[in-house]
Amino acid sequence: MTTAFRATLAAGALAWLAAAPLPAQSGAGPASYPPQTRFPGENAAAVARHLSAARRLAGSDLLPEFYWRCLTSPLDKATVFQIQHNGLVEPTRVFDQLYSVGQNAVSAWALDTRDGIILIDALNSADEARDIIVPNLKKVGLDPARLRYVIVTHGHGDHYGGAKYLQDTYGARVVASAPDWAMMERPGRGPFAGLVPPRRDVVVKDGDQVTLGGTSVRLYVTPGHTPGALSLIFPVTDKGVAHVAGLMGGTGGGQDSASVHQQVASLRRWQALTTAAKVDVPITNHPTHMAANEKLALIRYARPGDANPFLYGQAAYRRFVGVQEQCSRVQLARMGETGDD
């Protein structure tokens, strides 16, 4: 490392610290520090029981997934906002026909077929579709004019925000369940106030398929996170070797007791569906749910012979779904319930 390079690096680090001081260096007192979320009515014994079950299922290889879903996400919102921020991520070919083309906070996946592209989720807005998805498709060698379908996994703005732009610009068909079409068509709130949804197009039912260019994506309605969250099973290959990917459309938990109970039931059903389909690849619609951005970096810097980090294997995928279920049961226990059936 040259002296000039060290000087440049040091100057950059000092500039970063000056622009964004760490909380401990900001001069603010402890009274201003954000607390972890508290659950005063929780059933502590049930929380402990389901946390223990989730941790056992996680083993050592799925600890990041366990930590995020069971602990970090519900307990430490400040960390969630720091990690799950809007940011640019290098688009990456993950499987022979599957590409990550989203951003740091939320995923978008392009499934390439001989007759066009199926896009899974459309980020937050028309701006992100135009300035992130479209350039990312081009960077990995895909022509956005070949977009044929946009599958919206659930009716939150960060997943359908760019769908209308892609519908209007490229004529892509937009796919969602009936409950989540209705959800998208209601006026948005908070950061999604004023967001214009896509025109209602393809309404799918549980068990339907979207087929394009010989590739079929099976769709299942898995309520919980939203009333009509869609979960997907589809084939991929890694250097020509066949695998099966599974994307649970709403792993972020429910909003109240009833929706979390729905989530638990959906995850149990998803376990059966993905076991029967021999799913061995997890795909998520937020990178944080499986440390996906870290895995993308491993792929970009892979050496010959390195394993694809998205290949979990069937047994590990079953444990992954089991962790999600137990973490939903933890959520119920934090509401004061047992978390049991």
Which residues does each predicted region cover?
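Conserved beta-strand hairpin/beta-sheet module of binuclear metal-dependent hydrolase folds
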Residues: 84-140, 231-252
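Bacterial N-terminal signal peptides
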Residues: 8-20
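Active-site HxH/HxHxD metal-binding segment of metal-dependent hydrolases
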Residues: 33-40, 49, 56, 127-131, ...
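Signal peptide processing junction and immediate N-terminal pro/mature segment
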Residues: 20-26
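Accessory terminal helices/loops
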Residues: 26-81, 239-242, 250, 254-341
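Active-site environment of divalent metal-dependent phosphoester hydrolases
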Residues: 127, 155-161, 181-184, 227-230, ...
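Active-site neighborhood of phospho(di)ester-bond hydrolases with catalytic His/Asp-centered motifs
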Residues: 120-121, 146-155, 175-177, 221-224, ...
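Metallo-beta-lactamase
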Residues: 87-88, 93-95, 131, 142, ...
